[in-house]
Swiss-Prot record:
Residues 1-20 are lumenal. It comes from Saccharomyces cerevisiae (strain ATCC 204508 / S288c). Lanosterol binds at residue 126. This is Lanosterol 14-alpha demethylase CYP51. GO terms for molecular function: heme binding; iron ion binding; oxidoreductase activity; sterol 14-demethylase activity.
Length: 530
């Protein structure tokens, strides 16, 4: 005990001497030291880290806490490519105080997506971002077992029979937008210019709300209610990921919008209960009939309302971005537009047949266009999990400690020539049956929301994998298929003089085209009334 006291006393004496010397310095030198010391500590820490053979190599950085945030945030795929050449498929970097361990390629997909629930957590990685937008008790603000059951509840409304009923509803909304939106007004105009990042988010939310949430909720989007969705949407930004709550105006608007929208859903739910008006019209009816967990606990109306927000907002960004990218790629490929048009005319008998869900399945080129767009533009360039227990990386000496995050990027793999020859070229025919690579579905597993492929080592994973795989894949293909079918049959489009496909904007949470992203459209049949 006396020895310990002696050591502590001696240490305090040195601290006091150092502090005295520091206070004796001129003010300018003291300020300089305060600034320099964190940088020195940061460099020393990195040097000591590099000596550890049980850690993946760390990307060197100069600015404490910030780390590699700027270069990663601006051009993530270029950042991954440079790091891969230097370190291989496994490396770490610092992102705003977090250590992110990246594992690139199909083996990385397997390592992260099929990791044990006890080892990694999506909830711990994302809850601070999603809960203020979606609300309490759903998605990532609940135990994983609850989330798996919530996905099962929602999946009950995403059946083949439901999709058959959605197709005419989605088509009706697209034609209505073509007629009434100031961006088109096709009954008054034969040509015009649009910014796809204005039109596609609107068309996506109109079609999704009409099909999934019913006529009553869709009608509200024609009022000021639409501005609430816009305010809520602005809660999905990188600054919200880093700082979930700040005393800023857009945070206050986000919180107000969440309460107002969930309150509107709750009013509709209560009205249907009161009138015993629960049918099979939409997702709201489906959740009101089937939202009891295995342990007998029922979701509250507030939780159902929050889950409805999560379903609509969760798919809104990704489908809007994908439809925008499709239009942009086709704008410089009139040959592909013509191929798609001929397929439409063939399947729909020259336009005599009404589009149906079954007929959508007979349009391989249309579906390959969606598939190729998702390959080139994965909606999310990075997917995270927080490490909860130390994880050994198979066939290496690396151990990823608890508290770190693991990061996987299927979008980066999608753009590697080793998996997709000429990967940066838009080529819908790479998916032809006689030329497309065949990826085995393999063993299936049920995480609680229905059986899905357990294999996630495929280089093509546009909807993620494992227990957090997106359940909206078939709805996305249905929605995008109807949308693009009508675009192709109704319009032709091209770029303004000197323009081409814009580069991706990686500064948002979803990979969007850099704006403005304008195309010039013209009606195929100027006399046609919509």
């Amino acid at each position: 005990m006396s020895a310990t006291k002696s050591i502590v006393g001696e240490a305090l004496e040195y601290v006091n001497i150092g502090l005295s010397h520091f206070l004796a310095l001129p003010l300018a030198q003291r300020i300089s030291l305060i600034i320099i010391i964190p940088f020195i500590y940061n460099i020393v820490w990195q040097l000591l880290y590099s000596l550890r053979k049980d850690r993946p190599p760390l990307v060197f950085y100069w600015i404490p806490w910030v780390g590699s945030a700027v270069v990663y945030g601006m051009k993530p795929y270029e950042f991954f490519e440079e790091c891969q050449k230097k370190y291989g498929d496994i490396f770490s970097f610092v992102l705003l105080g977090r250590v992110m361990t990246v594992y690139l390629g199909p083996k990385g997909h397997e390592f992260v997506f099929n990791a044990k629930l006890a080892d990694v957590s999506a909830e711990a990685a994302y809850a601070h971002l999603t809960t203020p937008v979606f609300g309490k008790g759903v998605i990532y603000d609940c135990p994983n077992s609850r989330l798996m059951e919530q996905k099962k509840f929602v999946k009950g409304a995403l059946t083949k029979e439901a999709f058959k009923s959605y197709v005419p509803l989605i088509a009706e909304e697209v034609y209505k937008y073509f007629r009434d939106s100031k961006n088109f007004r096709l009954n008054e105009r034969t040509t015009g210019t649009i910014d796809v990042m204005v039109t596609q988010p609107e068309m996506t939310i109109f079609t999704a709300s009409r099909s999934l949430l019913g006529k009553e909720m869709r009608a509200k989007l024609d009022t000021d209610f639409a501005y609430l969705y816009s305010d809520l949407d602005k809660g999905f930004t990188p600054i919200n990921f880093v700082f979930p709550n700040l005393p800023l105006e857009h945070y206050r608007k986000r919180d107000h919008a969440q309460k107002a929208i969930s309150g509107t859903y709750m009013s509709l739910i209560k009205e249907r209960r009161k009138n015993n008006d629960i049918q099979d019209r939409d997702l709201i009816d489906s959740l009101m009939k089937n939202s009891t967990y295995k342990d007998g606990v029922k979701m509250t109306d507030q939780e159902i309302a929050n889950l409805l927000i999560g379903v609509l907002m969760g798919g809104q960004h990704t489908s809007a971005a994908t439809s925008a990218w499709i239009l942009l790629h086709l704008a410089e490929r009139p040959d592909v537009q013509q191929e798609l048009y001929e397929e439409q005319m063939r399947v729909l008998d020259g336009g005599k047949k009404e589009l149906t869900y079954d007929l959508l399945q007979e349009m391989p080129l249309l579906n390959q266009t969606i598939k190729e767009t998702l390959r080139m533009h994965h909606p999310l360039h990075s997917l995270f999990r927080k490490v909860m227990k130390d994880m050994h990386v198979p066939n290496t000496s690396y151990v990823i400690p608890a508290g770190y995050h693991v990061l996987v990027s299927p979008g980066y793999t999608h753009l590697r020539d080793e998996y997709f020859p000429n990967a940066h070229q838009f080529n819908i025919h790479r998916w032809n049956k006689d030329s497309a690579s065949s990826y085995s579905v393999g063993e299936e597993v049920d995480y609680g929301f229905g059986a899905i492929s357990k294999g996630v080592s495929s280089p093509y994973l546009p909807f993620g994998g494992g227990r957090h795989r997106c359940i909206g894949e078939h709805f996305a293909y249905c929605q995008l298929g109807v949308l693009m079918s009508i675009f192709i049959r109704t319009l032709k489009w091209h770029y303004p003089e000197g323009k081409t496909v814009p580069p991706p904007d990686f500064t948002s949470m979803v990979t969007l085209p850099t704006g403005p992203a304008k195309i010039i459209w013209e009606k195929r049949n100027p006399e046609q009334k919509i």
